[in-house]
Swiss-Prot record:
Location (main, coarse): cytoplasm
Gene3D superfamilies: Nucleoid-associated protein YbaB-like domain
InterPro entries, per database record: YbaB-like_sf, YbaB/EbfC
UniProt source species: Helicobacter pylori (strain HPAG1)
Protein's recorded name: Nucleoid-associated protein HPAG1_0033
UniProt keyword Nuclease, yes or no: no
GO terms for cellular component: bacterial nucleoid; cytoplasm
């Protein structure tokens, strides 16, 4: 493969990555903690798009903090795992060329 082909290949990969990122915005990852008392949802690019807190937790600040941290951490992990999978899939496609 010569350098002109490599440039075209890289441009194609950039375009594919942009399309995957755009599509990934529509993917929603939801995590719950405290038996569902706290629920958080992130889109595929890591933006928090929904937060639900059971009313009974409003009187127990410490429990709410613990459940919220747990749900947020799980949500972040799900988004990161999804991003890793996308990257590995792209690398797999690149290796086939």
């Amino acid at each position: 493969m010569d350098f002109s082909q490599l440039g075209g290949l890289l441009d194609g990969m950039k375009k594919e990555f942009s399309q995957l990122e755009e599509k990934n915005k529509d993917t929603i990852h939801t995590s719950k903690s405290g038996g569902g008392m706290v629920s958080v949802s992130f889109n595929g690019v890591g933006e928090l798009v929904d937060l639900q807190i059971d009313d009974s937790l409003l009187e127990d600040k410490e429990a709410m903090q613990i459940y919220l941290m747990s749900a947020l951490n799980d949500g972040y992990k799900a988004v990161e795992e999804n991003r890793k999978n996308l990257a590995f899939n792209m690398l797999g496609n690149f290796a086939k060329l």
